[in-house]
């Protein structure tokens, strides 16, 4: 039972991690003009707001990698903690099995 709970917890954290990276660049492509004449350049009219994580809009490229790096820092500790607990749980289960067999 404990194993199942741990697996569910790991899945939840993984989903959180993936969704966090996924939502960053949604606003990026909404500003391009649907203009068929390539010589006319449309100005962007102040539609871009500040970036949620960095406070400014400057880091456009490599954004996903940066947010992923940050998230590995943030969730890496939790993941290692869970893996440690998982291995301890496995050890306990194995020891109990040995005890019951003998």
Swiss-Prot record:
- Mind giving the lineage of the organism this protein is from? Eukaryota, Viridiplantae, Streptophyta, Embryophyta, Tracheophyta
Residues of the region (Disordered) are 24-55
User: Other comments?
Assistant: This protein is coded by the transposable maize controlling element 'Activator' (Ac), which is able to activate chromosome breakage at a specific location.
Q: Which organism is it from?
A: Zea mays
What name appears for this protein in its UniProt entry? Transposable element activator uncharacterized 12 kDa protein
**Keywords from the named record:** Transposable element
Basic residues composition bias: which ranges? 24-51
Origin: domain of life = Eukaryota
């Amino acid at each position: 039972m404990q194993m199942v709970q741990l697996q569910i917890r790991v899945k939840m954290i993984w989903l959180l991690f993936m969704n966090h990276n996924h939502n960053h660049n949604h606003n990026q492509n909404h500003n391009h003009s649907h203009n068929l004449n390539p010589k006319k350049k449309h100005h962007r009219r102040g539609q871009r707001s500040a970036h949620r994580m960095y406070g400014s809009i400057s880091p456009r490229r490599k954004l996903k990698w940066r947010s992923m790096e940050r998230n590995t820092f943030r969730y890496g500790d939790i993941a290692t903690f869970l893996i440690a607990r998982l291995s301890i749980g496995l050890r306990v289960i194995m020891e109990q099995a040995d005890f019951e067999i003998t």
